[in-house]
Swiss-Prot record:
Gene source species: Pongo abelii
Designated name of the protein: Enhancer of mRNA-decapping protein 3
Matches recorded under SUPFAM superfamilies: YjeF N-terminal domain-like (SSF64153)
Keyword entries, A-Z: Cytoplasm, Phosphoprotein, RNA-binding
Disordered: annotated segments: 89-192
The protein's role, per its UniProt record: Binds single-stranded RNA. Involved in the process of mRNA degradation and in the positive regulation of mRNA decapping.
Gene label: EDC3
Amino acid sequence: MATDWLGSIVSINCGDSLGVYQGRVSAVDQVSQTISLTRPFHNGVKCLVPEVTFRAGDITELKILEIPGPGDNQHFGDLHQTELGPSGAGCQVGINQNGTGKLVKKPASSSSAPQNIPKRTDVKSQDVAVSPQQQQCSKSYVDRHMESLSQSKSFRRRHNSWSSSSRHPNQATPKKSGLKNGQMKNKDDECFGDDIEEIPDTDFDFEGNLALFDKAAVFEEIDTYERRSGTRSRGIPNERPTRYRHDENILESEPIVYRRITVPHNVSKEFCTDSGLVVPSISYELHKKLLSVAEKHGLTLERRLEMTGVCASQMALTLLGGPNRLNPKNVHQRPTVALLCGPHVKGAQGIRCGRHLANHDVQVILFLPNFVKMLESITNELSLFSKTQGQQVSSLKDLPTSPVDLVINCLDCPENVFLRDQPWYKAAVAWANQNRAPVLSIDPPVHEVEQGIDAKWSLALGLPLPLGEHAGRIYLCDIGIPQQVFQEVGINYHSPFGCKFVIPLHSA
């Protein structure tokens, strides 16, 4: 009774721990209650062992996928089995990729003489006319469907890339019919249905193989070859190449020195430029001495006022919008700037800045209180300013009530601190705070107490003072002091301006 099932293709489910096995029954032992399968597949993957034996207690479910016919179980273990039909034609039994038997039509011929290849029409007629003997050697649709279910996705048949992708553009896609498609599948299996080689269960050791590669020896061999061939060597001491590549530096670059300016006293605050150069602050006494020595060497007050006015006006034009705001298309909306100046040298700097702004088609309103006696620099600047289209007012009531585009503050001077107690000064501070316009301070002093007008930007001259948070963002202006003048007052100076006359400073 047990021998009747030899050669059958079965599927054995051993639960979640062992999985599902498929194969052909090779032995059934009723005494020990075991069953053996040859060419087994475990969960769709071909096993490395040729035979697997199961106990009855391990089997959860057993399904019979195929029962051999009469006389088929005599040679079930062979790889190829041949049966002769009534017409003398044979069919060959092979093992497909999932291990189950597959019947492939192959005419048996005792002669090795070449055969004539039939035409395409003859092949079609032969495919349609199937003899009863050939039907016995072909599998049913259910058997082919069961084989496709048990086949693993990772072991699918390799396809011919030329046949699938290199079809002639004018060639029509063949229609798929049931009978013809099945015969084409069998022909593909004859060509591409080889058994897949066994895959080793050990992973490739990348680290171990990399350790076997001696890079030092290879590099030494390359260097030796280059020296013998006369080519440019790599890393040989006291040897210069004859030619340089286009991306090689001929001159070695020196290390960058970021601290190029040193002062003779302790620095209370340091700044840095966009390129990283350190700019130290100096005290008001040292700054005053620097301007005095520069004036003695020819940098007069008139020249200093002109440089300050030009740089401050350029910065103000940039803050107003630059070419986007000041162009012929925006004549109807000219920017408005309010100048708040005091009766001192810093006020004269603001008046000269206002004159340059007025020359650039900016509407300037200058506030300067009336005094009986003015400085000569103030008088000269007012004389030039009166020749522009700018407006001068001495009363805060004449200042615009609507917000302006920019307020330039030149009210404060460290030598005239008493002006902060004057009514006009307090009124000007109140107007600037109520106007809510951004404020630019030109050469602001250092105050122990907070200023009345908080600036958004501040422009320092030569070297910055240790300004606080009330000064806003600090900018530095080059007023043309020579390097030897800095050295005369004890400052080791190297220009941080580069190609500009006004540069921004950042807190270090």
